[in-house]
From Swiss-Prot:
Signal peptide: none annotated. It is found in: Cytoplasm. It comes from Staphylococcus haemolyticus (strain JCSC1435). This is Probable transcriptional regulatory protein SH2225. Its main location: cytoplasm. It comes from the Bacteria. InterPro entries: Integrase-like_N, TACO1_YebC-like_2nd/3rd_dom, TACO1_YebC_N, Transcrip_reg_TACO1-like, Transcrip_reg_TACO1-like_dom3, Transcrip_reg_TACO1_YeeN, YebC-like. Disulfide bonds: none annotated. One of its GO terms (biological process) is regulation of DNA-templated transcription. One of its GO terms (cellular component) is cytosol.
């Protein structure tokens, strides 16, 4: 992929020192997925994928059960998936994914976060073309060669397999998430350190110390917003 790997879980743990924020975001996403179809991951592919991702963040069962029960019962909240694109200092690019029951509030909050922290919002498509939607898996205990050979034996295509530190990273097409994960399990993988959808930048940029400080404030401001689920960017943070 030509890009340094940033461990999603470690990044989230650093940014979200209060894990309740992560749990709240997954609770909302699980509710929406369960409400969109059957509240059973065996028959609801969207719900299954969210639950697989939630495992890698150690989301407690009571959070998951509460969200699914809410979808089964009287939960009548409707949420929209929104994507915002924008720019930070020195050509940095950001994609902000949100899940909201109040579009006007979210748009205003995201715009304010950009404006107050050295950035500005762009129009739809102004940034996304520089990123690739990717299913990403992180595994310990197996080499890239072993994983690639095992996947080839199962006739499973992936974009790339690399090693970064203690992790072997598998990049795949997003619509192949479940297929690739099942294939990896067939190779003996029992635990995924990462199982996530990402928007990966095609190229990274580096910022000056001052610009990076501004950029990190922008990221923090966006991730602090209640409706924001994910923030992706093209900066190689030092």
């Amino acid at each position: 992929m030509g890009r340094k790997w940033n461990n999603i879980k470690e990044k989230k743990a650093q940014k979200d020192k209060n894990t309740s924020r992560i749990y709240a975001k997954f609770g909302k996403e699980i509710y929406v997925a369960a409400k969109s179809g059957e509240p059973d991951p065996e028959s609801n592919q969207a719900l299954r994928l969210v639950l697989e991702r939630a495992k890698t963040y150690s989301v407690p069962n009571h959070i998951i059960d509460r969200a699914i029960d809410k979808a089964k019962g009287a939960g009548d909240e409707n949420y929209d998936h929104l994507r915002y694109e924008g720019f930070g200092p020195s050509g940095s690019m950001l994609i902000v994914d949100a899940l909201t029951n109040n579009v006007n509030r979210t748009a205003s909050d995201v715009r304010a976060a950009f404006g107050k922290n050295g950035g500005n919002m762009g129009v739809s498509g102004s940034v996304a073309y520089m990123f690739d939607h990717t299913a990403t898996f992180g595994i310990e205990g197996k080499s890239a060669d072993d994983i690639l050979e095992a996947l080839m034996e199962q006739d499973v295509d992936v974009r790339d397999v690399i090693e970064d530190g203690d992790l072997t990273i598998v990049y795949a097409e997003p619509d192949q998430f479940a297929h690739v994960q099942d294939a990896l399990r067939q190779t003996g993988v029992e635990e995924f350190k990462v199982a996530e959808f990402e928007m990966l930048p095609q190229t990274d940029i580096e910022l000056s110390e001052d610009d990076q400080a501004t950029f990190e404030k922008l990221i923090d401001a966006l991730e602090d917003l209640e409706d924001v689920q994910n923030v992706f960017h093209n900066v190689d943070l030092k």
